[in-house]
Amino acid sequence: MAAASISAIGCNQTLIGTSFYGGWGSSISGEDYQTMLSKTVAPPQQARVSRKAIRAVPMMKNVNEGKGLFAPLVVVTRNLVGKKRFNQLRGKAIALHSQVITEFCKSIGADAKQRQGLIRLAKKNGERLGFLA
C-alpha cells in the first residue's frame, strides 16, 4: 500500500487538468478569504432606538390607593407583618365578610343576583375607606 500526498498550495501547473489556483483560503471565484471578508462584513452599526417613550405595562391598581380613613393603618400593618402574611389575612377577612353577606341574604330571602350586588358594593366601600390600600 503506497501512500500518496497531494499539496494544494502552489499548484499552478495543470498536472491533472484542474483549474484550482491558490491556497486553502481561496473561494470559488478565486479571491482569498481576507479579501472576501473585507467586502462582505460591514462594520457593526448602532441599533436604532425609537424616540417615542416606551409605555409601561398597565397594572391593575386601586384608584383610591393611599386614600381613605383606614389606608395608613393598612399600610403600616402590611409593612409590619409582611406582604405575604398580610394578603393571607386580607383574604380570610374578605371571605368571612362574604359569608356574612351570604347569611344576611339568606335571612331576608334575597336571590344570588342581589347577593352579588351587595358584595360588589362592599368592595367599592372598602376601596373608598382604604381597606384595599
Swiss-Prot record:
It is a peripheral membrane protein. Transmembrane segments: none annotated. GO terms for biological process: cellular response to light intensity; photoprotection; photosynthetic electron transport in photosystem I; response to high light intensity; response to water deprivation. Disulfide bonds; Cys-11 and Cys-105 are probably involved in the formation of disulfide bridges with 'Cys-300' and 'Cys-303' of PGRL1A. 'Cys-272' and 'Cys-275' of PGRL1A may also be used to form the disulfide bridges, but in this case the cyclic electron flow is lost. It is found in: Plastid, Chloroplast thylakoid membrane. It comes from the Eukaryota. Disulfide bonds: none annotated. Keywords: Chloroplast, Disulfide bond, Electron transport, Membrane, Plastid, Thylakoid, Transit peptide, Transport. Residues 1-60 form a transit peptide. InterPro entries: PGR5. Disruption phenotype: Normal green leaves under continuous-light conditions. Not able to grow under fluctuating-light conditions. The kea3 pgr5 double mutant combines the phenotypes of the single mutants in non-photochemical quenching (NPQ) induction upon overnight dark adaptation. The double mutant missing DLDG1 and PGR5 (dldg1 pgr5) has a pale-green phenotype similar to the dldlg1 simple mutant in continuous light, and a partial compensation of the growth impairment of pgr5 simple mutant under fluctuating-light conditions; higher NPQ than in pgr5 but lower NPQ than in dldg1. One of its GO terms (cellular component) is chloroplast thylakoid membrane. GO terms for molecular function: electron transfer activity. The keyword tRNA processing does not apply. Its main location: plastid. Induction: Up-regulated by drought stress. The keyword Cell wall biogenesis/degradation does not apply. Belongs to the PGR5 family. PANTHER family: PROTEIN PROTON GRADIENT REGULATION 5, CHLOROPLASTIC (PTHR35709:SF1). Critical for growth under fluctuating-light conditions. Involved in the regulation of the cyclic electron flow (CEF) around Photosystem I. Essential for the reduction of PGRL1A by ferredoxin and for photoprotection. Contributes to maximize photosynthesis efficiency after a long dark adaptation via the regulation of non-photochemical quenching (NPQ); acts independently from DLDG1. Promotes the induction of steady-state proton motive force (pmf) and energy-dependent quenching (qE). Interacts with PGRL1A and PGRL1B. This is Protein PROTON GRADIENT REGULATION 5, chloroplastic. The gene is PGR5.
